[in-house]
């Protein structure tokens, strides 16, 4: 009796990933991925063009619509491509068997890719395969009709896939230069597909420090709508942050934003020198871009071949909003109001009921504000200087000339002082700070003009009252001897002579003879002011006379009382001096 021993059959438990290229663009993407050496995936190419299939490097190819197109292309007709795919649906399902995840890549805008890709996606979804679509949009120079066809195909494909990634070919100009060849540009676009597939393959196949499997990938990408993929590599100082920035800022992807992502898959790969702080820095930088409630799955892989380099791969899913909707929210009411204001030439928002009156009122307000601005800019505030309370120390000529000059320079209604100068400066600031071209100034210009007009009227009225009541105050100076009356001069000289001591007979005789000559008529207490030629200074002359009369009561000596006291002092001094003098006896006897 023979006993046969053999090993039991063990089913392969590793997930199977298939890259399905549809049409000419999909076939070229598969060829570029094969040339790049991507491992761990199966490649399938399906096309209606027999000549393009002959150039494919994939092991499995599908001739679509042999009876419909007879080996020719679809002629940029999506209906033909769809019919060709429906003809070969059984063969497509056979190639999708035993697959856990399928990437469908195609170029939108043509016939085969636009029409056949949704058919392949529906077949994969019906078999429960996680389906991810990676498609391109045509260039701008290919025309608007091809772009409309591509958008319609993308809309149809999105209904049949779990996650969709769109790469506009026009974005190739962001990274290309004048020396970039046409083939190299398409290879750059295919690099997005390659990096996304490679990152997911590494997560599911390679063993890492933080291991992820296909179940984690499915939870992030199942029925998530629009998505984005990105990979960044960096070395040197700050390499972790630089790699994360490059991963989330892929210039080739469609105008999408990670702010509304509901699922996030982060894969960080590095050598033995990758530190914990670098992993934390890169992961936190990416996590800041998504919603706080997003499903974040993180994986880390140790690869000895990446010594000194950190690679960060990101897959963000559930992005259903455009970047323009996130950055610039649209408010129809606000935009309508702004447009209506910009159409108004005068800068005031016009109402529908009275458009003509509002326009006239706004134009008059603008003219009033401009005139006020010119007048305020021409006026200069006068600095206030110290002056004594009395007007007796002021120079008469300076008073007259300054008064006339002040009246000529600052007419009534526009005179400036220290107090009102501040108000004028404030009004000037308000006038200059009104941007007449901005929408905010257009709304508030009416109220500002009303306030400025009221302020101007108040200033003019107060300045007129101030000019009528308050006289001109001359600058302070030290009084001189010539400013006093001649009687004061004589009194000072005579008093200085009394202080010298007893006088001789000749001095007394000389004093008695010259005493009456020294006494002059009553001195003028008021300064000799020249008559003002300007009639506007009449009020000022009255004010000066009133103040001078008040000062005379303080400084002017009373003539009657002063002369009497002076005569008594002279008689007493004469008697005392006569007794002190040595008069000869014969003169004394003759006098008696």
Curated annotation (Swiss-Prot):
UniProt-annotated location(s): Cytoplasm
Keywords of this entry: Cell cycle, Cell division, Cytoplasm, GTP-binding, Nucleotide-binding, Septation
Major subcellular location class: cytoplasm
Amino acids binding GTP: 24-28, 111-113, 142, 146, 190
Any GO BP: division septum assembly
Keyword GTP-binding in annotation: yes
InterPro entries attached to this UniProt entry: Cell_div_FtsZ (IPR000158), Cell_div_FtsZ_C (IPR017844), Cell_div_FtsZ_CS (IPR020805), FtsZ/CetZ (IPR045061), FtsZ_C (IPR024757), Tub_FtsZ_C (IPR008280), Tubulin/FtsZ-like_C (IPR037103), Tubulin/FtsZ_2-layer-sand-dom (IPR018316)
Any GO MF annotation of the entry: GTPase activity
Chain residue ranges for the region called Disordered: 333-362
CDD domains on file: FtsZ_type1
An annotated GO cellular component: cytoplasm
Family: Belongs to the FtsZ family.
Matches recorded under PANTHER family: CELL DIVISION PROTEIN FTSZ-RELATED, MITOCHONDRIAL DIVISION PROTEIN FSZA
Protein task: Essential cell division protein that forms a contractile ring structure (Z ring) at the future cell division site. The regulation of the ring assembly controls the timing and the location of cell division. One of the functions of the FtsZ ring is to recruit other cell division proteins to the septum to produce a new cell wall between the dividing cells. Binds GTP and shows GTPase activity.
NCBIfam families: ftsZ, FtsZ_alphas_C
Quaternary state and interactors: Homodimer. Polymerizes to form a dynamic ring structure in a strictly GTP-dependent manner. Interacts directly with several other division proteins.
Protein name (database record): Cell division protein FtsZ
Protein's organism: Bartonella bacilliformis
Upper classification of the organism: Bacteria, Pseudomonadati, Pseudomonadota, Alphaproteobacteria, Hyphomicrobiales
